[in-house]
């Protein structure tokens, strides 16, 4: 079960990703269990877990992470003007993801479920609000079969079981806010916005290599 203590607002050192991050994952977007969008209202892009052990260090295992993603522009949904970049380069967007079995649903097979968030220049749809309206998570049109490149930059938390679906959704909402706040720090935001650092530039080039 999820501990009752408050969640930290950011994770990872302010100086930037530390080993073993950044970690690269890629693959075509495949159909998942069909629950993220329909039951939870949280659209996810799933990619195959094949070869995961080769790139993901054993000490990390299952859990929730944050990072940045790019989709092959040849088959991805057209980006909004706020997400677009110069030329034909694929937009790089923030993301939160889970790798594991989702104890609430008692999954028997491991999955990689990626929720692509809106650009950090836009208001956060998952920000806390005093209004009691249902949170509306960021949604893109379906893009099954599109190649996705993901750069994992940090770890958020382990997997938990939950007493209710509402508790699960609320924790995912907080995950999105933690990911957003973590990525807004200068040493992480450069992976979205770019700079002159050769290491970061190389990672951004890989993200857009389709």
Curated annotation (Swiss-Prot):
GO terms for cellular component: mitochondrion. Its cofactor is Zn(2+); Mg(2+). Mg(2+) binds at residues 44, 46. It is an enzyme of class 2 (transferase). GO terms for molecular function: ATP binding; metal ion binding; riboflavin kinase activity. Pathway: Cofactor biosynthesis; FMN biosynthesis; FMN from riboflavin (ATP route): step 1/1. Keywords: ATP-binding, Flavoprotein, FMN, Kinase, Magnesium, Metal-binding, Nucleotide-binding, Transferase, Zinc. One of its GO terms (biological process) is FMN biosynthetic process. Zinc or magnesium. The active site is at residue 113. SMART domains: Flavokinase. It catalyses: riboflavin + ATP = FMN + ADP + H(+). Residues 1-24 are annotated as: Disordered. Belongs to the flavokinase family. Catalyzes the phosphorylation of riboflavin (vitamin B2) to form flavin mononucleotide (FMN) coenzyme. This is Riboflavin kinase. It comes from Emericella nidulans (strain FGSC A4 / ATCC 38163 / CBS 112.46 / NRRL 194 / M139).
């Amino acid at each position: 079960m999820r501990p009752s203590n408050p969640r930290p607002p950011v994770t990872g050192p302010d100086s930037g990703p530390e080993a073993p991050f950044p970690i690269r994952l890629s693959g075509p977007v495949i159909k998942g269990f069909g629950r993220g969008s329909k039951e939870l209202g949280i659209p996810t892009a799933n990619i195959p877990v094949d070869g995961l052990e080769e790139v993901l260090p054993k000490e990390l295992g299952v859990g929730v992470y944050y990072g940045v993603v790019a989709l092959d522009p040849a088959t991805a949904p057209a980006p909004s003007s706020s997400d677009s970049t110069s030329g034909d380069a694929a937009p790089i967007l923030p993301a939160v993801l889970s790798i594991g079995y989702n104890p609430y649903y008692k999954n028997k097979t491991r999955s990689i479920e990626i929720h692509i968030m809106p650009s950090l220049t836009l208001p956060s749809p998952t920000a806390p609000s005093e209004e009691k309206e249902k949170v509306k998570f960021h949604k893109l049109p379906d893009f099954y079969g599109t190649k996705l490149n993901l750069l994992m930059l940090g770890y958020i938390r382990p997997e938990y079981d939950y007493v209710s679906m509402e508790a699960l959704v609320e924790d995912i909402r907080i995950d999105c806010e933690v990911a957003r706040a973590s990525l807004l720090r200068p040493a992480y935001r450069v992976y979205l916005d770019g700079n002159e650092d050769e290491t970061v530039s190389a990672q951004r080039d890989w993200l857009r290599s389709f």
